[in-house]
Amino acid sequence: MRGGQGAARAPVIQFTNCRILRGGALLREDLWVRGGRILDPEKLFFEERRVADEQRDCGGCILAPGFIDVQINGGFGVDFSQASEDVGSGVALVARRILSHGVTSFCPTLVTSPLEVYHKVLPQIPVKSGGPHGAGVLGVHLEGPFISREKRGAHPEAHLRSFEADAFQDVLATYGGLDNVRIVTLAPELGHSQEVIRALTALGICVSLGHSVADLGTAEEAVQSGATFITHLFNAMLPFHHRDPGIVGLLTSDRLPAGRHIFYGMIADGIHTNPAALRIAHRAHPKGLVLVTDAVPALGLGNGRHTLGQQEVEVDGLTAYVAGTNTLSGSIAPMDTCVRHFLQATGCSVESALEAASLHPAQLLGLEKRKGTLDFGADADFVVLDDSLHVRATYISGELVWQVEEARP
């Protein structure tokens, strides 16, 4: 029903009594939807001479583009890095459960794993449109194994790899193919990394720099080769130093290709990044900040021991550690919690907080005409929020896919 006459015959839904996020501002306007897309009401009125078939009162709520999570390792007991005969059912469970947190699209993320895990899991996670069944899958994020041993974090050292002489063929042999892959995180200081970055970006795959001890010069060279993202800024990289700020220095570098800027992921869970560091990053480069959850399989579960790939993770309160260590191992905060914490910690505008979880990840992936926006013609993926940014409802392609249960009298 999205194209041609089919879309034109679809019912027109008018969402009223709302504030919609468009063009960086919250506007008191109605949102018009038909055939799964955002509709221009002027064309409806003056060219088609039609009105809405249905009106829905939003009770003064905010309508924002659906959240996009480009780094999520699992959740609700599901570990994307665990090979099984039915990986798809686990992905589907997470896709369904994250709807309640306003996420309409995501990149299932695999941490460093044995080769057989990549070969078994990757073919089972195809790109998939969202709907009542769950959030859409935009492609897999492969975080490792081509990362620094020194900054491996929760990644198992035994399965880390360096690039062989025929580097891109080594990548293909490691992953077993790249058909379902959208993002690859690697350490740019590894030998042959620049040729790998060029080869991946030529295929339309986003290259992210992370788990790395790279200096600024090496990071800048990686961006010149095509890298566009930084994996969880500040975490698992050299700390900022005034004589060589390392990867962090990319936020204000003057050696990036003309017309391009770097995007960077931030885990705003109140654990991974001090509020002062959040403020420094946001004030230095607000348009590049991408909120990510980096959620682990323990998301939505209680205290105790859980898995993350080949490692055991221990959850204590709001923090997840590699079992028996003090090394952080992902987050257990969902995306809407990260948005609220980011807003509170940085003092930024509501609009900026919402765009960090929607527009910016869409721009990173080159999807800003379809996702992360409520502009005319975009996919009608949006989240309904109250003034405190708690999710009231989630829509995908204009269809209600999740709604909060109202308190009973």
From Swiss-Prot:
The gene is AMDHD2. The active site is at residue 294. Keywords: Carbohydrate metabolism, Hydrolase, Metal-binding. Binds 1 divalent metal cation per subunit. This is N-acetylglucosamine-6-phosphate deacetylase. One of its GO terms (molecular function) is metal ion binding. Substrate binds at residues 154-155, 235-236, 243, 269-272, 328-330. SUPFAM superfamilies: Composite domain of metallo-dependent hydrolases, Metallo-dependent hydrolases. GO terms for biological process: N-acetylglucosamine catabolic process; N-acetylneuraminate catabolic process. It holds the Pfam family Amidohydro_1. Belongs to the metallo-dependent hydrolases superfamily. NagA family. Its cofactor is a divalent metal cation. Hydrolyzes the N-glycolyl group from N-glycolylglucosamine 6-phosphate (GlcNGc-6-P) in the N-glycolylneuraminic acid (Neu5Gc) degradation pathway. Coiled coil: none annotated. Pathway: Amino-sugar metabolism; N-acetylneuraminate degradation. A divalent metal cation binds at residues 143, 211, 232. Its EC number is 3.5.1.25. It catalyses: N-acetyl-D-glucosamine 6-phosphate + H2O = D-glucosamine 6-phosphate + acetate.
